[in-house]
UniProtKB/Swiss-Prot annotation:
GO terms for molecular function: structural constituent of ribosome; zinc ion binding. A zinc finger (C4-type) spans 10-32. Its cofactor is Zn(2+). Disulfide bonds: none annotated. It comes from Natronomonas pharaonis (strain ATCC 35678 / DSM 2160 / CIP 103997 / JCM 8858 / NBRC 14720 / NCIMB 2260 / Gabara) (Halobacterium pharaonis). Zn(2+) binds at C10, C13, C29, C32. Keywords: Metal-binding, Ribonucleoprotein, Ribosomal protein, Zinc, Zinc-finger. This is Small ribosomal subunit protein eS27. InterPro entries: Ribosomal_eS27, Ribosomal_eS27_Zn-bd_dom_sf, Ribosomal_zn-bd. It comes from the Archaea. The keyword Ribonucleoprotein applies. Part of the 30S ribosomal subunit.
Amino acid sequence: MAGDFIRVHCDDCENEQVLFGKAANTVNCAVCGSTLATPTGGEADLHGDVVDVVESR
């Protein structure tokens, strides 16, 4: 299973969080709880700004 780990910036609280680019579950911000990623069956639909690719596989 190839995919990237991505650092995403939360638009609501300025938190940065690392998540898997092909997330199978909804990913919420650990600080404020807003949705950062929604699964789509492939690449996740990101709801924040991508800051960096932490690890590319």
